[in-house]
Design a protein with these regions (language model features):
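Short linear motifs at protein or domain termini
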Residues: 1-93, 97, 101
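Short, Lys/Arg-enriched, disordered terminal segments
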Residues: 1-12, 196, 208, 212-216
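Short helix-capping and inter-helix turn/linker motifs at the boundaries of alpha-helical repeat units
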Residues: 8, 175-178
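Regular secondary-structure segments
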Residues: 18, 22, 96-100, 112-123, ...
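Contiguous, function-dense segments enriched for cysteine-driven chemistry
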Residues: 40, 56, 78, 135, ...
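A ubiquitous short alpha-helical element
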Residues: 78-82, 99-103, 120-126, 166-175, ...
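Conserved amphipathic alpha-helical segments that form helical-bundle/coiled-coil interaction surfaces
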Residues: 105-169, 180-184, 198-211
Length: 216
């Protein structure tokens, strides 16, 4: 029989302070005062100090020379999310343009095999499965640019949505990613016959889907 591991005081502080940031109780620019948090959480200052350091490492908090630890403007709302998806869409279309102009051979088999893997996962109800596959699709396409800068931005985009997206953004991303997966076969077929204009239009459709899902 497995025993449940006891949560440390630092992890309790981390979880509770993070919750306050994500629900807006602690807003961007607010100072994190150890004494105040200690009283609110009924925990000594030492684990609170450690938790603040952990939150800083995760991007929720930054240190100011004059004000100490303050809440960063890290939470991704709907408007910021749409801006990020537009940028990602531009990168993906740039990859298609490069495949077209440089006459690069598209690895159809790799994407087809991945699509088969996705189909085998359809019984899973958790929408994050599809979000992870959408990330794979974007990363795979961006490899044709042969530029780690684009890959890093794409990687950060998907990771930041998971970590910093507000509740509305997470739902939009998950629902829109299902539409992306539904269109992968269309993308493969278009690439196979060198119909690059259709591929570009499909990317536009995928980006637009994020907006349409939000206002459904």
């Amino acid at each position: 029989m497995t025993t449940k591991r006891k949560e440390t005081r630092e992890s309790v502080c981390y979880r509770e302070i993070k919750k306050k940031i994500r629900n807006g109780e602690l807003k961007p620019g607010d100072r994190l005062i150890e004494n105040t948090l200690s009283q609110q959480l009924e925990i000594s200052r030492t684990p609170i100090r450690k938790a603040i350091g952990m939150l800083a490492a995760d991007g929720y908090i930054e240190y100011n020379d004059f004000r100490g630890a303050i809440v960063k403007d890290s939470i991704i709302n709907k408007e910021r999310y749409f801006e990020m998806t537009e940028i990602l869409g531009l990168f993906l279309k740039q990859a298609i343009h490069k495949i077209r102009t440089k006459k690069i051979t598209f690895n159809k088999l790799e994407m087809t095999n991945k699509l088969a893997e996705i189909k085998n996962q359809e019984h899973q109800e958790h929408p994050l499965v599809y979000f992870d596959y959408e990330k794979w699709f974007a990363q795979n396409l961006l490899t044709y640019l042969k530029n780690n800068y684009y890959l890093k931005i794409s990687e950060d985009f998907f990771n930041n949505i998971k970590e910093f997206g507000d509740e509305e953004v997470i739902k939009i991303a998950q629902n829109a990613s299902v539409k992306t997966i539904d269109n992968i076969q269309n993308f493969i077929d278009a690439m196979d016959v060198h119909d690059y204009d259709k591929c570009l239009n499909l990317i536009d459709d995928l980006i637009d889907a994020h907006v349409l899902v939000a206002y459904r």
